[in-house]
A protein has these predicted regions:
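FabD-like malonyl-/acyl-CoA
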Residues: 2-171, 299-329
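Alpha/beta catalytic cores of group-transfer enzymes, especially the acyltransferase/condensing modules
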Residues: 25-27, 118-276
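Glycine-rich phosphate/pyrophosphate-binding beta-alpha loops
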Residues: 75-77, 223, 282
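Short, high-confidence coil segments that cap the C-terminus of an alpha-helix
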Residues: 212, 295-297
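Short amphipathic alpha-helical segments
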Residues: 266, 270, 279-283, 308, ...
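A short, acidic, amphipathic alpha-helical segment used as a generic capping/interface helix at domain edges
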Residues: 277-295
Length: 329
């Protein structure tokens, strides 16, 4: 009689597989995508985007102006399309990385890019969806002045208590229904905090007393992934429901809980929540790279502007980051 471990099974060497990550808003910069223009397919992605959107996105990416590029309704398109264009570079230079990809995830907006890559969303429909998401979020931004800041802190810092003090300060100033809380879980001792602009200013001015080692404001126009974005959920969810989604061909991890989507109804339920819930990126990295001791890690490729996600991976899982590479837009 055969022992269970004697049964012949297919074996895929983890080293021969890949994980592809996509960045989010805040990574945009004037001059982005210039390095990708030598790849015809990358240029074609921009041509398609220009056609769907009705304006010259590539020109905005290459030439700015920066204040226009940083506006939510432009930044989200710029980052998503640049990321998909960077994917074309990866396909050209390392086709095996695409063919052997077993999982994908994207930070905030990047999750929609990941869903396009995984075959869930058609590119043109995703562009329209991002337009609705961005416009709805911009309306929420215009309604309440909000901001976000990256916070580095030590083991003796209580981020929750610091945010509570910021909220109380806003209440004392007469601000209606203020909010301040964690909007992104980045890596150990680093989070992004979002809330009313006055709350962020309070944290900046009182960082020493609150035992915050460093605080850096992010170039975004609102408090994303906080309840201040509540008004953006309904238009986004309504638009998402109208799109005929396909089942993902590889695992796609959700920002909301750091776990893979199970099926299309799960995507329809979770993705709108992402607008008001913290991005659990640190938790996602733990889930994606969890494996038995001694097993090799897959290659990781970050496609899009900047090298931020690979740098985060280095702090969450240094061994997994050893074989990580940024394909920069």
């Amino acid at each position: 009689m055969l022992e269970p471990d004697e049964v012949v099974r297919p074996k895929i060497d983890p080293k021969e597989t890949s994980i592809i990550l996509f960045p989010g808003q805040g990574t945009q910069y004037v001059g982005m995508a210039s390095k990708l223009m030598r790849f015809p397919e990358a240029r074609r992605i921009f041509d398609l985007a220009n056609e769907v959107l009705g304006y010259d996105l590539l020109k905005l990416c290459l030439e700015g102006p920066v204040d226009k590029l940083n506006r939510t309704e432009h930044a989200q398109h710029a980052v998503m399309v640049s990321s998909l264009a960077a994917l074309e570079q990866l396909k050209e230079e390392r086709p095996k990385a695409i063919d052997t990809c077993v999982a994908t995830a994207g930070f905030s907006l990047g999750e929609i890019t990941a869903l396009v890559f995984a075959g869930v969303l058609p590119f043109d429909k995703a562009l329209k969806l991002v337009q609705i998401r961005a416009n709805a979020m911009q309306v929420a931004c215009d309604r309440v002045a909000g901001g976000m800041a990256m916070v580095l802190y030590g083991p003796d810092t209580e981020i929750g208590a610091a945010c509570a003090k910021a909220v109380q300060w806003c209440v004392d100033k007469g601000i209606e229904n203020p909010y301040c809380g964690v909007s992104n879980y980045m890596f150990p001792h680093c989070k992004v905090v979002g809330g009313n602009i006055e709350a962020i200013e309070f944290l900046e001015k009182n960082s020493k007393a609150l035992k915050i080692r460093r605080i850096k404001r992010l170039p975004v126009s609102g408090a994303f992934h906080t309840p201040l974005m509540e008004d953006a959920i309904e238009p986004f969810a309504k638009a998402l429901k109208k799109i005929p989604l396909q089942e993902p061909i590889i695992r796609v991890y959700s920002n909301v809980d750091g776990k893979p989507y199970r099926h299309v109804p799960h995507i329809l339920k979770q993705l709108p929540k992402q607008i008001v819930r913290p991005v659990k990126w640190e938790q996602t990295m733990h889930q994606m790279y969890e494996r038995q001791q001694g097993l090799d890690f897959p290659r990781t490729f970050e496609c899009g502007p900047g090298k931020g996600l690979v740098q985060i991976l280095e702090k969450v899982n240094a061994k997994a980051a050893n074989t990580a590479l940024s394909i920069e837009a």
